[in-house]
Every structure is written in C-alpha cells, then in structure tokens.
A protein has these predicted regions:
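Sigma70-family region 2
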Residues: 12-13, 39, 49-66, 85-87
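C-terminal flanking helix
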Residues: 27, 31, 52, 126, ...
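DNA-recognition helix of helix-turn-helix
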Residues: 118, 144-174
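A short pre-motif secondary-structure segment
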Residues: 132-136
Length: 182
C-alpha cells in the first residue's frame, strides 16, 4: 500500500485515485475523532468532508511522515471552531438502538453496560487526557504525531498518556470494573 504522502502527491499531480484512497483510509476514523468533540456523528461526517475539502483545495505542503498528524490537527481545529459556534440539539440517535439478533441477550446487555461505563468514565476524564488516549490507542498515532496534533511536546504526551491511563483506571474501578489493565 502506498504511503499517505505518496497518495497526497499523486492527487496533487492530478490523479484523483490518491484522494479516493486517502478518504477511504481516513474517512471513518477521522469522523469518529471529530465525533469525540461534537457528539453528533452527522455533523462529524460533514466536518470530515470539510477537512478533506480544505486539504485538497488549499493543497498545503506536508512533510514526509506528517500527513496523518496534519489531517488530525486540521480536524481538531475545525471541530473546536465548530463546537464553539453551535448550539446543543436533541439527537434521535441517542434514544435507543436495536440489539444485534445474533448475540445472546445477556451478552448484548453486558457489552452495552461496559460501553456505557467506559464512555461515562471517558467523559469524566480531563479532556486533554481523553484526547491523547484516543489518538494513541484508537488512532494508533505515535507520541510524536499526537504531540503535533495537540501542539504539545512528546514528553508532555508521554506524561499525559500515563496520567490518563491512571485516571481512567481509577474511574473504572469506581464504577466496579476492577480488571482494568494499562
């Protein structure tokens, strides 16, 4: 598979296949990242498209190995700007979700409860800790990439990941989840 920067250069040279490959690779993860700020997946999808539109109309120069960090940094800035401008709305998505018929009812309930507790604990955390844990664990970014996205140093990211894991562990234990490992 071609590296991100090669796909970006391919697009800059006029081949839309590079754009399609980058959107396919980063569309869903970037939407989830933005949704972490907005808590509205539909708005997050729109902002994800705006991030790509900005990137591909402005065509900034991106250093080798820095495409993913640049993309997430742009998404973070757009999400924060959008969040500061919008008013809270009621979401129909929050009402209910239908369980998957293939799973046993107990397993569905247990999984939903675990997810609810995890989301509750993540929401209780310091937002900076939550963000670096998301970037390093869910987006599989290196500490250097997470530092570039957040505007912090690698040392600060290292400390924040450690403190974030400790904070999450304490919150999970408070909610009765005692097998939380680092």
């Amino acid at each position: 598979m071609a590296c991100d920067e090669a796909l970006y250069r391919q697009y800059l040279n006029g081949d839309d296949a590079g754009l399609e490959a980058l959107m396919k690779k980063y569309g869903d993860p970037l939407t989830l990242y933005i949704d972490g700020y907005l808590h509205d997946v539909h708005e997050a999808e729109e902002l994800m498209l705006d991030v790509f539109a900005y990137l591909f109309t402005k065509k900034p120069k991106i250093r080798d190995g820095g495409f993913k960090a640049y993309l997430y940094k742009a998404a973070r800035h757009m999400a924060l700007r959008h969040k500061s401008k919008r008013k809270p709305l009621f979401s129909l998505d929050a009402l209910t979700s239908e369980p998957d018929g293939r799973l046993l009812a107990e397993e569905v309930i247990r999984t939903e409860e675990r997810n609810r507790i995890l989301h509750f604990c993540m929401d209780e955390m310091n937002p900076d800790y939550r963000e670096v844990l998301y970037l390093t664990y869910f987006e599989d970014m290196s500490y250097a990439q997470a530092a570039e996205v957040t505007g912090k140093t690698v040392k600060q990211i290292t400390n924040m990941v450690y403190r974030g894991k400790e904070s999450l562990r304490r919150l999970l234990e408070r909610e009765g989840i005692t097998n939380a490992e680092s």
